[in-house]
Amino acid sequence: MSEHSDVVVVGGGVIGACVTQALAARGAAVTLLERESEVCPTASAVYANCGLLVPSEVEPLAHPGALGQGLRWLLDGSSPFYVKPRASLDLARWLWLFRGACAPEVARSHAPLLHELSEVSAALHDELAAVGGGPSIGGGRGHADAGRGTGDGIGGEGGGAGWRFHRNGWLFVYETAAGLAAAEAAADQTRALGVRVEVLSATEVRERAPQVRAASVVGGVLTPDDGHMDPAAFTRAMVARAQRDGAAIVTGAEVYGFETGGGATGAGVRALRTTRGVFAADQVVIAAGAWSPRLLRELGLRLPIEPAKGYSIDVARPDGTPDLPLCVGEAHVVLTPLGETLRLGSTLELAGWDMRLRQKRLAGLRRAAARVVGVPDEGPVRQVWRGPRPLTPDGLPVIGRSPRHANMVLATGHCMLGLSLGPVTGRLAAEVCAGETPSIDITALAADRFGV
């Protein structure tokens, strides 16, 4: 054996980084394995996503309205949620489970749990930023940041700099009466869980964000407690903090096999075989995002997680663009200001591991930004990105012990909420590894809910 740790964490994205940080902060001897040459690699779901911290997102992806809307979108290549037709038993299983999760009684039972996870994680984000990280610009929950600031994501944690996040809300704008009416109905349900939501008229939208230029905007919804940050900077800062607390970070370590059974772990995982050697551990955490099912199949687990391709485009941020994230509601296009960059992002595309860039998708992002806030739909692009979000059928993550391996903990399947739920996932995974009762009841997040 080349290495032995209390815990080995597989995956150097935001979830793996947060789990490693939480374990190292507790004094565990933890090793993080990342298959690429650096943590938070460009292929990861967090590298260039929209950087949203959204405690307001309490409605899971699978909800009653999603089924009807999804059926209209599924085979439309330009829709926000597209399923590429293909012969796949895994996809068929995922769609069947998604259908069941959209049942009203199921969705209603999931929303309070997602709200609790989001609220606790938002508080942990504040705590992490207060101790050696970047400031929460805007003065904390419920305060607006009126200025452009000095930019998000300023390096690692050297010199007390760290990342920055802005807690100044998220503004949705709608261009149709039907879109606004649906948003108002959703706002009522969200308020019932204690989330602050404001419905705005077209005039109020322009008062809050004068940069919104489209005459077609009929109104909007503001979630004032949401925020944004550079997701890659945050992830790397968590890894740097874990290293400072003694964690070992091993890159270029692709896991290709497991050694199981025997020893102190019983019917568990004794070691992981990787391209950088063999790593033994008392416990293993799988936090590999969309790659998790591939790893777990080696152990007989078939998690229904689909790699949902998302896109983003970085352009130079024009003067006068909004200081808070904006979502063009009907198009589901998000515009996030990140310092001198404006990131345009959207879409869920279930195309298996086909990660090709589709020009139609990219053009749709630019058209929406041009129409609503006047961002030129042609011109220089700083970066074009796509990456796989780990999408579960019910929109909830998988957190808890493996149903088949006593010393393996799963922390994956966060869909589009990895950045938001990273800190709470780190805490919960660390509690499970320590044999403690989790501080939040995560029974509903167990992998065996999918019959694995």
Which residues fall in each region the model found?
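A conserved short coil-to-beta-strand element within the FAD-binding core of flavoproteins
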Residues: L200-E204, R208-A209, T251-R270
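Glycine-rich FAD pyrophosphate-binding loop
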Residues: A25-Y47
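Active-site substrate-recognition segment that forms the wall
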Residues: N49-L52, E57, L61-C102, G257-T260, ...
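N-terminal Rossmann-like FAD-binding beta1-loop-alpha1 element of flavoenzymes
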Residues: S5-L32
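C-terminal lid/capping helical subdomain adjacent to the catalytic/cofactor pocket in oxidative enzymes
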Residues: S5, V199, L396-V398, S402-V452
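Rossmann-like flavin
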Residues: A92-A240
